[in-house]
Amino acid sequence: MFGSLVKKVFGSKNEREIKKLWPIVARINELEASISPLSDEQLRDKTAEFKERHGKGESLDALMPEAFAVCREASKRVLGMRHFDVQLIGGMVLHSGKISEMKTGEGKTLVATLPAYLNAISGKGVHVVTVNDYLARRDSEWMGRLYSFLGLTVGVIVHGVEDDQRRINYAADITYGTNNEFGFDYLRDNMKFSLDDYVQRGFNFAIVDEVDSILIDEARTPLIISGPTEDSTDKYYVIDRIIPLLKKGEVKEEEANTLSGKRKLYTGDFTIDEKAKSATLTEQGVLKVEKLLKVDNLYDPRNIEFLHHTQQALRAHAMYRRDVDYVVKDGEVMIVDEFTGRLMPGRRWSDGLHQAIEAKEGVTIENENQTLATITFQNYFRMYKKLGGMTGTADTEAEEFHKIYKLDVVVIPTNRPLLRPDFPDVIYKTEREKFGAVIQDIKEHYATGQPCLVGTISIEKSEVLSELLKREGIPHNVLNAKQHEREAEIVSQAGRLKAITIATNMAGRGTDILLGGNADALASQWRRANPEAGEEEYQAILKNYKTVCAAEHDEVVRLGGLHIIGTERHESRRIDNQLRGRSGRQGDPGSSRFYLSLEDDLLRIFGSERVSKIMDFLKIEEGEAITHAMINKSIENAQKKVEAHNFDIRKHLIEYDDVMNKQREVIYTQRREILGGQDIRESFLEMLDETVEEIVASYAIEKSPAEEWDWQAINEAVFKCFNLQFELPQDTMARLTPAGLKEMLAEQAHALFAARVKEMGDDLIDHLIKVMMLQAIDTHWKDHLLNIDHLKEGIGLRGYGQKDPKQEYKKEAYELFMGLIMRIREEVVERIFWVQLERPEEVEEIEEEQRSKKIVFNLSEEEERVQEPARSNRVAGRNDPCPCGSGKKYKKCCGK
């Protein structure tokens, strides 16, 4: 009550943020009178003036009102669009390094031009990040006209662009591109053998479009560049053949007291946990698998791989469904993005799961790959000095944006009031009844001519609905991952009279649905179908389409605008809001309603018990629906529970990945220094001295007399590392200390190295050191990534030993990293002292061989794959430590 009173008197935090910006809007509007009369050339000269003033110390904040006024005027002249006042506010929020939440149709693409232009004045580059190649190309071409008019350069980074062109595009003042391409370029750069081959420059300012999709939905998806291993794929077929012989079981009553409480007993050979998407063999199942695979003990270290692949095969058969989680296209298993419904070609599930699904579907199994380089979007985007974001739906995730990225969300007022009523959910007992009601609703709207956009959560459901509509004789378009090529075309016409569009979550983010249809898109479609037609004929067709669309627009507005029908609630409220947001853009009328059933995944897994009790209490008959605020609240609570669970997983992921991130920064910085040739000789001599220290520390014990040291081991280590037969005069043995031994060894090793330099020459030895250092770093870093993966997979089990998994992970990851540094050092020192060159060109040949390997991995064998968070396959008891690695009890964490 007190909180609402304070809000009434002082306004919400969001309102106060917006209020502070209105005076700057007024200042920009005042400047319009002096900017408008300028000629095109004078307007362009303003950019050079701003650069000069900034170079002399004037801040970008001070330049902002003038720069925004210039950008707005240029937009009027070039694009025919003048930024609204609320769009100016959106631009200021982005410039200040925050997230602008702007409703669909409020012109986010145009808003981004303001902070992009202002920040490009510094000359340090601006990256505008989009979710796909189509939007990156479209926006760079569309808005690029504005930037070019103002004297700025524009680049675009999409799949298939060669390195030389990428370098030019990154050097531009403003660079558009996809999140994947930006991330992969960072990884690829740090695998190169010359700084001249790098394509990226510094991380100055990024504006992330659809920021919720990239920084929340994709946060658990690391970018991975990997190369093939030589493991056989036969094992996947062998294991796949035994899966149909295993019977799914259920949990029996908890029986048999144990030290940790009651133990769950199971029927059948395996059980599944839909919440965790995991499958577990029962004791009976383990015995059966051992018999089928003809192995004695599945838990024997030599057979543990069989156990792992059996569990992955169980998941493939029991948890992953064709046309829901993936599709089979052209003999390949392609993942379907659960958030957008789009196909993700090239992406693969890790840890043998993808191969298990390939075996299940009977397609060719591709080898598992070994990670060569990896980074999460969370850590990639945190490298930018300043980060801003835009989306229509961020407020529900405001806490996560603030906690993980230090990004505040500011909700920007709409230019025109939102006129869309969102009707209460309608809930049925069964999916059959629900679909019957959806079809009836579509028929009623189709009869009047009002367009409908019907949202489904999977390809499978969209095709079921399509089949039902075909039976009713209702023409419609289906937009799912199978028809993604026609996405923009279908979405742009979804607002026409009598248009019925069924869409998975992808629903064409980035393409506006115009009521009455999009005349330009229709004319472009006609032009593609009639390439021989002349410009005059095209203009006549365009004029005709504009007349038709204008008439349809007025009729659709009269009918109530675009009607949204949701056929299922998503786990995230944000995705539901995105579907609703397709309607009611820029003051257009519209409406939305969700139809649900107790058989829907969200209600079945997370909340149906309470809802079912309410329906039983109200004696709901078959075919009868219910709309009740209490049920809506239960559904929202189920969604909040899932959102909180997913947030916890992402938070734990970043805490673990931060450890890896620091190690990656050290390795990549060292690599760049080597490529820059900075003090490379001094770096090698430091390695040499550290190797001497390591040998002495290992075998020369401070408190023991020198006679008792392990001299055989010392001599072997010295010979192995330095190719040196170390001889110690007998008369020095009695008074020798570890410090004295270190000094003698270092002196002899330095002398030997000096002889090598004299023999090979300064340039050749420096080149050799550089090549050997890079080779050692790349080889051992790859192995280190594999070791870290293995560590991460098993670390959750430490909780059972009353240890904090996170602390154990940090400690062991540090030990692994120190081991990595030591192995790199030893290998470089050994190679420099042992390598025999018959001719100087051999160093370049070694370097070229290494470089060509990287090119293979980068271009033909590179693979971007989805790596799911590691989970323990054991089902945790309520008082057990949570397998997610938080260190809390399961009942207090993911088991809530």
Curated annotation (Swiss-Prot):
EC id: 7.4.2.8
Record-level Gene Ontology MF annotations: ATP binding; metal ion binding; protein-exporting ATPase activity
Catalysed reaction, written as an equation: ATP + H2O + cellular proteinSide 1 = ADP + phosphate + cellular proteinSide 2
Database matches in Pfam families: P-loop_SecA (PF21090), SEC-C (PF02810), SecA_DEAD (PF07517), SecA_PP_bind (PF01043), SecA_SW (PF07516)
InterPro entries attached to this UniProt entry: Helicase_ATP-bd, Helicase_C-like, P-loop_NTPase, SEC_C_motif, SecA, SecA_CS, SecA_DEAD, SecA_motor_DEAD
Protein topology in the membrane: Peripheral membrane protein
Similarity comment: Belongs to the SecA family.
Assembly and interaction partners: Monomer and homodimer. Part of the essential Sec protein translocation apparatus which comprises SecA, SecYEG and auxiliary proteins SecDF-YajC and YidC.
HAMAP family assigned: SecA (MF_01382)
Name of this protein: Protein translocase subunit SecA
Species the sequence originates in: Pelobacter propionicus (strain DSM 2379 / NBRC 103807 / OttBd1)
Gene name as annotated: secA
